[in-house]
């Protein structure tokens, strides 16, 4: 077995942990972006419904 590889094992674990953290934050950011975009779309639809309801009342 190559013992030199085991000397770098803690560094490899830190790199793996950092990569995992970066990916997790990236996915969380995408989810937040998608939710904001969806909320904006829903608000637009609700505003259009209100306008149509006001036109029917007039």
From Swiss-Prot:
Gene Ontology CC entries for this record: membrane
Subcellular location field: Membrane
Chain segments annotated as transmembrane: 9-29
Domain of life: Eukaryota
Annotated signal peptide: none
Family matches, as InterPro entries: SMIM11 (IPR042125)
Ranges in a coiled coil: 29-58
Name this polypeptide is given: Small integral membrane protein 11
Organism for this UniProt entry: Bos taurus
Designated gene of the protein: SMIM11
